[in-house]
C-alpha cells in the first residue's frame, strides 16, 4: 500500500475512490485497499468465492476487466469501528458498461470488513450480491427523517 491509512474515515474514502476506478475498468486502486493476508476473503457478486490475497488480486483484475466507462458509488447504511475491526454495510450504485454492453444501472449489496494492521486500516473481507426481490412484497426505499438514526424503512 502506498499511503498509510490510519483513520477509518480515510479508509472509507479510499475505498470510495477505488470503486470509482473499478467501475471504469481500473482495479489497481481497489486492490491497494486490501490487506496482504492469506485470510483475506471475497464472496463476490458475480460468483467468485476466494481466500488469500493472490486469489483476490486475480479476481479483482477479472472484475475490473469486465467494466468500462462507469463508476460505482458506495452508500453506507451502517459504518462502525471498534478496536482493530470495522465494517460497512450498504450498497454500491452506478451506471456501468459490463462486458462491452450498453451503459446500465447497477446496484450491489455490500458488506466490507476492515482490519487495522500495524496501525493501518485495510479491507479483509467483502460480501456482495445483487439484491433479490423481497419475497414479502416490500421494497427498501429511502425514508429520511421517519425514525431518528435510520435512513431506510421497509414497506
Predicted regions located by residue number:
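A beta-strand edge to alpha-helix "cap/lid" segment located at domain peripheries
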Residues: 2-35, 39-155
Amino acid at each position: 500500500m502506498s499511503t498509510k491509512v490510519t483513520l477509518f474515515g480515510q479508509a472509507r474514502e479510499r475505498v470510495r475512490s477505488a470503486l470509482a476506478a473499478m467501475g471504469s475498468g481500473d482495479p489497481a486502486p481497489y486492490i491497494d485497499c486490501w490487506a496482504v493476508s492469506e485470510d483475506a476473503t471475497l464472496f463476490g457478486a458475480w460468483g467468485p468465492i476466494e481466500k488469500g490475497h493472490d486469489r483476490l488480486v486475480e479476481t479483482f483484475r477479472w472484475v475490473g476487466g469486465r467494466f468500462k466507462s462507469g463508476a460505482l458509488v458506495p452508500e453506507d447504511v451502517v459504518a462502525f469501528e471498534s478496536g482493530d475491526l470495522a465494517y460497512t454495510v450498504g450498497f454500491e450504485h452506478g451506471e456501468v458498461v459490463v462486458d462491452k454492453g450498453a451503459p446500465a444501472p447497477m446496484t450491489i449489496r455490500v458488506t466490507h470488513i476492515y482490519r487495522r494492521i500495524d496501525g493501518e486500516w485495510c479491507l479483509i473481507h467483502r460480501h456482495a450480491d445483487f439484491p433479490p426481490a423481497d419475497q414479502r412484497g416490500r421494497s427498501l426505499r429511502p425514508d429520511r427523517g421517519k425514525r431518528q438514526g435510520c435512513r431506510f424503512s421497509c414497506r
